[in-house]
Amino acid sequence: QTLLFGGLESVEHNAKRKNGNIRFFEFGNCYDYNIDHKKEGETLAEFSEDYRLGLWVSGSRVDNNWAHPNEKSSVYELKAYVENILVRLGVNLQKVIFGNLANDIYSAGLSITTSSGRQLGTMGIVSPKICKELDIETDVYYAELSWTLLMKEIKKSKVTFSEISKFPAVKRDLALLLDKNVQFAEIEKIATESERKLLKNIALFDVYEGKNLPAGKKSYAVSFYLQDEGKTLNDKQIDAIMKKIQTNLEQKLGAQLR
């Protein structure tokens, strides 16, 4: 069971009334049946209840903004919302893997799992077939998180406090040419293993597939954020870290700089 369809009805209702720029969320219970959980002498053991959070995004990213007149919502916007929720709950994003997912709900989907294998949810582009059946003419982006499992996950997290760094973070971008089957999660993993102390965040801000690229290739534009809590990083340190990350991406994924 899923929360998806109730939210899609609201998307359709609002879109037909010219309120097409959608940002919805809903909490609700979902019920699943698994015959493998059936136990002799225990009634209803094969049924389970899961409290979930659903997120729906559709339409333009910015309402009537002259500076961004045609900026549509995207799966990257939805992913940012999901990541912000996880961060606010205290989940370490470096231990979260966004992997490719194939199912009937999404035309392009991602599973959201921890490095230990716990599935926290799914997200992606809702199948056009489903949208058509509900008379929805625009792309809809949807994420569903298991609040039940998230609460179990954050119970394991130790809450720590530290002074905000007085020293600035540094951002460096790489435009990478990669095989189409390479996932962003692989880039995150390799980069984190390359620099555990000073690499604070990694963000994918552009994906390109099409003209002027070799067959079977895609381009990822990735930002790397570096920061030392005790001092300002100099160019020599930054260049050394980025060179190490770049070399490891080349050796392990066959990545090339564009």
Predicted regions span which residues?
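Extended beta-strand-rich architecture
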Residues: 1-258
